[in-house]
Each structure stands twice: as C-alpha cells, then as structure tokens.
Regions:
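Flexible coil/linker segments and helix-coil junctions enriched in charged and small residues
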Residues: 73, 77-78, 131, 415, ...
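Glycine-rich beta-solenoid repeat tracts in large extracellular/virion proteins
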Residues: 1-4, 24-30, 48-53, 74-81, ...
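Beta-strand-rich solenoid/repeat architectures in extracellular/passenger domains
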Residues: 8-23, 38-46, 58-72, 85-99, ...
C-alpha cells in the first residue's frame, strides 16, 4: 500500500499485505498517514514492512504484525526529508530475519517509537533492533518503551549514529543474544544513547552500552545494564566519547568490565550509581589510551584479578566514592604505563583477597590517596609503586593480612606518606613502608605496625627510606624494628620519632652494607627486652646517631655493630634496662662515641661501651657514664680493643663498676682521656686473663671508693701507666698485678686512702716503677710498692709515702723488692 500527498492508508484486522520483490515495501506513507492492525510480510531484499517519507507517519498498532525475511529489510522506517520529520510507531510486533535488517529505523530526522506494548525481534547478523541515523531538521530519534530482542551476530539492541539519538525508556527492555551484539550504541559526534530501562546482553564481547567516535551513552537513574558473556563490558566509551552511569551495571563474564573508556574518552559512575562485576579479570572501571574514568558511586568486583578501577597508557582514574574488591589479586585501583590513579578525600577502597593491593602504580605511573584504603588479604599492600612510579598518601591506609605492607616502592619508584595517623598494619611481616631496588620512601606522617616481624620503614637493594620531620613510627610486635636498611647503598634515616614496643625490636637497623642514620632532632626509643636502639650488622654496614636514642628493656643496647660493621654516636644514648650496653661492637666491628656523643646507662651490668671478639673495637671521644652496680665504662672481650681517646671521659657511679676492662687473651684497654669511678671495687682500668691495659701520657685515671684500684692486671695480664693515676679510698691501690701479671709505671701514681699501696704485686707477679716523682701515698699503711707471694717489685723512679706505717717498698712471702731510685 502507498499513500502520498496527504493521503491515508489502513491495513485492518485479519488483512494481510505480502510482497515478494526487492524494494517492495508493505506500506508507504509519503507525506501521508498509514496504519497497520493486520499483518505485513515482505520477502525481497530491501523491502521494509512500513515506511514513512517526507513528514509522513506510519503506525503499527497493538494487533499489527510485521515480518520481513531478507537482507536490509527493516520492519519500520521513518525517513525525514528537508524540514519534514517523518514518524513511525510500533505497538504491535515486528520481526526481521535477514542480515542487516533492522526492527525500526529513523533516518534524516525521522522518529521511530516502540511503544509499551510493542515488540521488536531481529534474527540476522547486524540486524539491529532500532536505529537512528543522520541529521535532518532535527536529530533522528528512536525510543523504546516496549521490548527489543536481537539474535544475530553484531546485532545491537538500539543504534544511534551520525548524530542520531536512541532512548530506552523506563519500561523498555532490550535483550541481545549473540557475539558483539551490544545493547545500545551511539556512534559519531552528536550521537546519543540513553537508558532508563533494562539492557541485557548474553553474547561474547557484547557491551551493554557503547559510545564511540564522539558519541555519548547515559545509563540513567532507573537504568539497569546486565551482561553475561566474556569481554562483555557494561558500558564502553571509545575514540573521544563519553559514557555515564547513574543507575546499575552488572557483568558476569570474564574480562567484562563495568565501564571502559579508551582512546581519549571519559566515563563517569555518578553518585548513587552501582557497578558489580562477577567474572575473573573483570574490572569495575577502566580507562585506556589517554582516557579518564571517575567514580562517584560504588564499585564491587567479586572475582580474582578484577580491579576496582584501572588506568592504562596515559590514562587517569579518580575515585570519589566506594570501591570494594573480593577476589585474589584484585587491586582497588591500578595506574599502569604513565597513568594516574587518585582516591579523593571522600573515596574509600576495601580489598579482601590475597595480593589485592589497595592502589598500584606501575610503569612510570602515579597514585595519590587522600581518602581511606583498607586491605585484608595476605600480601595485599595498601599502596604500591613499581618501575619508576610514584605513590603518595595524605589519607589513611590500614592492612590486616600477613606480609601486607602499608606502602611499597619497587624498581626505582617513590612513595610518600604525609597523613597523620595514616598507615597502620596488623599482620605479621606487614611493614609500614618499604622501598626496594633503588627506590625511595619518605614519611612525615604516622606509621604503626602491630604484627611480628613488621618493621616501620624498610630500605632494600640500594633504596632510601626517610622518616622526616613530623614523622612518627611505632611498632608493637616481636622482632618488629622501627627502620631497617638491607644491602649496599641502602639507607634509612630519621629526623623525628621512632618507637618500638615488642621484644627484639630494634629502633634502626643496617644490614649487609647498608646505613642507618638518626639525624639531629631524631628520637629513637625501644621499650622491651633485647631491643637495641640502633644495629649495624654485616660488612660495610654503618649506624650513625646524631640525635637521641633511648632503650628501656633488659639486654637492649643503645647501639650495636656486628660483623665488620660500624656504629658511630654523635648524639645521646641512654639505656635503662639491666645488661643493656650503651654501645657494642662484636665480630670484628667498630663502635665509636664521637666528641659530641654521650653514652649513659642506668641498669645493672649495663656497660657503657663493649667490644667483643678479635678485631672488634670501641673508641670514645665524648662522654661515657654508667650508674648501676657492675656496669663498666668500656669493655674489651676475647681479643677486642677498647680505647678512650684524648677528649673522652668515662665515668662510673656505682660499686664494682670499672672505668675500663680488657678481658680475655689479646684484649686491650687504652686510655688517653679521663676515667673517673665512684664506688667500692670500681677500678679505673682492669686487664684480666691474658689481657692488657695502658694509660698513656694524656690519660688520667681517678677512682673514689674502697678497694677501687687505679689500674689492675689479673691472671697473666699486663698494665702500663704513662699518665696520671689518683685513688681515694682504703686499699685503693694505684696499680695492682695479680696471678702472674705485670704492672709498669712511667707516669704518676697518687693514693689517698689507708692501706692504699702505690703499686702491688701478688702471686708471682711483677711491678716496675720508672717515673720521676712517680709514686706518692698519703694514708696510713699505704706502702709505695708491695711484692707478695713470690712476686717482684723494682723501682728506678721516685717513691714518697706520707702516712704512718707506710713503707717505701715492702716484700713478703718469698718476694723481692729492688730500688735504684729515690724512696
């Protein structure tokens, strides 16, 4: 049937129109009006069911049925012309079987509407349900309030191109079933697709909505998009296009993203909108090739390797809403290949799976967090930067899984933490911040770890980790160090506060050639047992303190150098616990207290400085002080050396606390500075068990206590004095050699107590005095030199005694004394 020039045509009820030739349309209204309530069937190529032209109208009523069977044979067509906008509506049924045979087509400003009762079904490849294309006096328009179903390959539910507009209304339902059969497509600048109803796709690579080449796609508040096939994204914007979701998007297939932007496009998940993905590798939102993705709503991914948001190849992703991922290796946000990911102040990221990183920057990318990141799985770091990337945190990061770091920089990357109370980890081995392989980590906020073996900050393999001004590090687990550097060129440094509360949790650690530096203004404090303030272990490792170090637990030394390492103190060291040395060098290591350095210990058996083992050395140019019984100033053990240099002062303030002790074969104690002891039996210097003690010309040894000997050689040891020895106290001898030991004096010895000999040799020992005006005693019974029990005393210098019964030289029990000097 054909009506023209304002005419009318009707196909009623049981009537049937059937055509068989090519281009043989069922009904045509050319600037006219046509209705069908019967049946229309076409068989030829390019044979439409109903066609309106030049402002005409065609209507397929509720009882109307249109069937086309060949290629390009559309069911309903509205073809505008000039300023004339043609119209076509469907309230009945339209079925097409041929390839590229659309259910309804609006072209050159035409309009087609599938009404609430209308049903459109297409079966051929590229047989789109409804199409609006080309501009006329107005954009071409296709709307659906009914049902649209396509079965063919690449057969879209609704398709807008070249400036057309397609709308799936609130009551509209779109279903596609084949590969590449997208629900709605908007192609070209000015083309728009909107959905307020339901869009469902079942095929592989079948997107819910697709905007490309400048098109725009909108899933509105009531809109529901659901896809079931692999690679079937909910919404896609490509080639400078735009897609926005204000409703709901659900995908079930593998590699099926909620929303994807690529090739310079922009996608938005707006406030109150939801995205849910169920398949593996199905990200919530993704931006690729210079595109941008923004989330203001909520994103949920349920399977493994399914990121909340991903930005790739120069793209950006910003989260202002909520991201939740449930699967293994399902990152909250990913920025890859010079891309950017940002989580704003209102943004929240929660991941549950193992290795599910909160935010991950990779390949020269950057990630910023101003909001909240929480991870629960093992190895699920809060933020990670890798391969020349950067991650920055101004917000809050919390991890609960084991080996789940707060922030992690790898392979020449950078991480920065600026927020107060900002990083907290709860699992074992979950470090606060870690930099590895020539990377950098900076903290000016808060880092807290609770698990065992969970360090505050770590630098590995040539990396740098710095706790800056404002930074506070606190660890609570066993073996959880405040800061740790491992490997040559690795460095940790502190300018503010480091606290550890667990057992064997050191403040700062340098291993295997690394460095640990506590700078001016830095404070390091440990509170539990065996928790050193600073530790350097391994050849080339170096620990330096320029600030303050405080330890409170038993066996918690201030600074320790082990295995050919070095520890230097230029600041303040304080230890409170028992058996807590100020500084310890062991296994061939070196520990030095510099001129500005102060070492103070308060616990029992807490020596100021200790060197243990061959080639180990402790040296002092500053001040060393001990305050409890049995706490020596400086100790050399098992072949080690202890040296108090010209500017060094050593002071002990309790009983049985020697100024310096050398113990064991080959051990050596050297004094060139000042040693002062206050306490009974607190000798100035002691050499025991084949050891040696030397007080050089610049050295001064002062003791104040009963039986507090100036220098004491015991058990085949030797003691030499070239400097000054002064003792105050009864039986406080100037020098004593006992059990086959030797003591020699070239300097000055003065004693001020009763029974305080200048020099004393006991049990097959030897004493020699060579100095002019070298021995003077002031107490009763304070002999100048005494040799007892097969011992020998020789004087070629000067001996003066001032007390009663104070002999110049005295030999008893098979001993001998000889003098060629003055007595």
């Amino acid at each position: 049937m054909y009506a023209m020039n304002g005419s009318f045509i009707y196909n009623y009820g049981a009537d049937t129109i059937e055509t068989g030739g090519a281009g043989s349309h069922g009904m045509v209204a050319d600037n006219s009006y046509g209705e069908n309530s019967g049946s229309i069937i076409t068989h030829g190529v390019g044979s439409y069911g109903m066609l309106s032209l030049a402002g005409g109208q065609v209507h397929n009523l509720a009882s109307g049925d249109i069937v086309t069977g060949n290629t390009y044979s559309h069911g309903l067509v509205a073809w505008g012309e000039g300023t004339e906008a043609s119209l076509g509506t469907n309230a009945g049924t339209i079925t097409t079987h041929g390839s590229e045979a659309y259910g309804a087509l609006a072209i050159v400003g035409g309009e087609v509407h599938n009404l609430v009762s209308g049903t459109i079904e297409t079966g051929g490849a590229y047989g789109h349900g409804m199409v609006a294309r080309d501009l006329g006096s107005a954009p071409s328009l296709a709307t659906n309030a009914g049902s649209v179903t396509t079965h063919g390959y690449g057969a879209y539910g609704m398709y807008a191109l070249d400036g057309g507009i397609v709308q799936n209304l609130a009551s509209g339902d779109i279903v596609t079933g084949n590969t590449g059969a997208h629900g709605m497509v908007a192609k070209g600048t000015g083309s728009i697709g909107t959905n307020s109803g339901n869009v469902t796709t079942h095929g592989t690579g079948a997107y819910g909505m697709y905007a490309l080449m400048g098109g725009q796609a909108f899933n509105l508040e009531t809109g529901m998009i659901e896809t079931g096939g692999a690679g079937s994204h909910g919404m896609v914007a490509s080639d400078d296009s735009y897609a926005e979701n204000a409703g709901s998007v659900v995908t079930h297939g593998g590699s099926a993203y909620g929303i994807l932007a690529q090739d310079g496009s922009f996608v938005l998940n707006s406030a109150d909108a939801t995205i849910t993905t169920g398949g593996e590798w199905s990200h919530g939102m993704a931006a690729n090739l210079g595109s941008m993705a923004v989330n203001d709503g909520s994103i949920l991914t349920l399977n493994s390797n399914s990121y909340g948001m991903a930005a790739v190849s120069g793209s950006g992703a910003v989260n202002n809403g909520s991201i939740v991922t449930m699967g293994e290796s399902s990152f909250g946000m990913l920025a890859w290949m010079t891309s950017y990911a940002g989580n704003s102040e209102t943004g929240t990221i929660n991941t549950s799976g193992d290795n599910a990183i909160g935010m991950y920057a990779l390949g020269g990318s950057s990630a910023d967090n101003y909001g909240y990141i929480t991870t629960s799985g093992a190895g699920a770091h809060g933020m990670m930067a890798e391969d020349g990337s950067t991650a920055r945190n101004w917000g809050d990061i919390t991890t609960y899984g084991s080996a789940a770091f707060g922030m992690y920089a790898l392979n020449s990357s950078f991480i920065f933490n600026y927020g107060a109370e900002s990083i907290e980890t709860w699992g074992d081995g979950s470090h606060g911040m870690i930099a590895s392989d020539d990377s950098y980590a900076d903290n000016s906020g808060s880092v807290i770890t609770h698990g065992d073996g969970a360090h505050g900050m770590v630098a590995l393999s040539g990396s740098r980790s710095r706790n800056l001004v404002g930074g506070v590090i606190s660890t609570y687990g066993t073996g959880s160090h405040g800061m740790l550097a491992d490997g040559e060129e690795s460095l940790v440094s502190n300018r503010d506060e480091v606290y550890t509360y667990g057992t064997a949790s050191h403040g700062m650690v340098a291993l295997n050639g690394a460095r640990a530096v506590n700078l001016e203004g830095g404070w390091v404090q440990t509170t539990s047992g065996d928790s050193y303030g600073m530790l350097a272990d391994g050849g080339g490792s170096h620990a330096v303190n320029r600030g303050g170090v405080y330890t409170g637990g038993t066996g918690s030394h201030g600074m320790v150098a082990s295995g050919d390492a070095t520890a230097d103190n230029l600041g303040t060291l304080n230890t409170l616990g028992n058996d807590a040395f100020g500084m310890l060098a062991q296994g061939g290591a070196l520990a030095r207290n510099m001129e500005t350095g102060s070492v103070i210990t308060f616990g029992t058996g807490s020596h100021g400085m200790v060197a243990d083992g061959l080639d180990s050395l402790v040296s002092n140019r500053g001040h060393v002080g001990t305050n409890s019984a049995g706490s020596h100033g400086m100790v050399a053990l098992n072949g080690a050396r202890a040296v108090n240099l010209e500017t060094g002062t050593v002071q002990t303030n309790n009983d049985d606390s020697y100024g310096m002790l050398a113990l064991g074969t080959g051990s050596l104690a050297v004094n060139r500075g000042t040693i002062t002891t206050y306490g009974n039996d607190s000798h100035g210097m002691v050499a025991s068990d084949d050891a040696r003690a030397i007080n050089f010309e610049t050295g001064t040894v002062l003791t104040s206590g009963d039986e507090a000997i100036g220098i004491y050689a015991f058990n085949a040891s030797s003691a030499d004095n070239y400097g000054i020895i002064v003792t105050w106290g009864s039986s406080a001898h100037g020098m004593k050699a006992e059990n086959e030991s030797t003591a020699r004096n070239w300097g000055e010895i003065t004693t001020y107590g009763s029974g305080a000999f200048g020099m004393y040799a006991l049990n097959s020992s030897f004493i020699y005095n060579y100095g002019n005006e070298s021995i003077e005693t002031w107490g009763d019974g304070s002999h100048g030199m005494v040799a007892e029990n097969s011992s020998l005393g020789v004087n070629t210098g000067s001996i003066t005694t001032n007390g009663d019964d104070a002999f110049g030289m005295y030999a008893l029990v098979d001993s001998g004394v000889f003098s060629s000097g003055e007595i």
